[in-house]
């Protein structure tokens, strides 16, 4: 399960950006073609957050649909796996244009009143 290491890296990046301020929420974008299982990230998140500024934070995951573009005719198509055939011309020469992402889209930190 490579999602454990990925989750640890996400938490390290967010904690570094938070600069010691407690984090309330983290939003990720995960592409359906990324080979990263969103449910596994959710499972690892609470465990990996323990003892960090992310402890108690909520995790929101936005799944990005897979899309491809035919290199022969330019048609854009939905992809549910990292390969397929063009709906228009039948070509297998597809370029993945969306769905392989893994992004930390945003994080929400607690307000600090001074």
Curated annotation (Swiss-Prot):
Q: Give the Gene Ontology MF terms in alphabetical order.
A: nickel cation binding; zinc ion binding
Residues given in the record as Zn(2+) binding sites: 70, 73, 86, 89
The protein's superkingdom reads Bacteria
Supply the Pfam families for this chain: HypA (PF01155)
Gene Ontology biological-process annotations: protein maturation; protein modification process
- Which PROSITE patterns does this entry report, sorted A to Z? HYPA (PS01249)
Q: Which UniProt keywords are present, listed alphabetically?
A: Metal-binding, Nickel, Zinc
User: What does the entry list as the binding residues for Ni(2+)?
Assistant: 2
Q: Which InterPro entries does the UniProt record give?
A: Hydgase_Ni_incorp_HypA/HybF_CS, HypA/HybF
Its family remark reads: Belongs to the HypA/HybF family.
Sum up the protein's function in the record's words: Involved in the maturation of [NiFe] hydrogenases. Required for nickel insertion into the metal center of the hydrogenase.
Stated name of the protein: Hydrogenase maturation factor HypA
């Amino acid at each position: 399960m490579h999602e454990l290491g990925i989750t640890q890296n996400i938490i390290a990046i967010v904690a570094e950006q938070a600069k010691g301020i407690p984090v309330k929420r983290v939003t990720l974008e995960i592409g359906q073609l990324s080979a990263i299982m969103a449910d596994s990230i959710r499972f690892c998140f609470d465990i990996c957050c323990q003892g960090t500024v992310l402890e108690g934070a909520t995790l929101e995951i936005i799944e990005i649909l897979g899309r491809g573009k035919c290199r022969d005719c330019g048609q854009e198509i939905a992809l549910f796996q990292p390969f397929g055939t063009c709906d228009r011309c039948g070509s297998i020469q597809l370029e993945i244009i969306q769905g392989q992402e893994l992004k930390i889209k945003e994080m929400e930190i607690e307000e600090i009143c001074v």
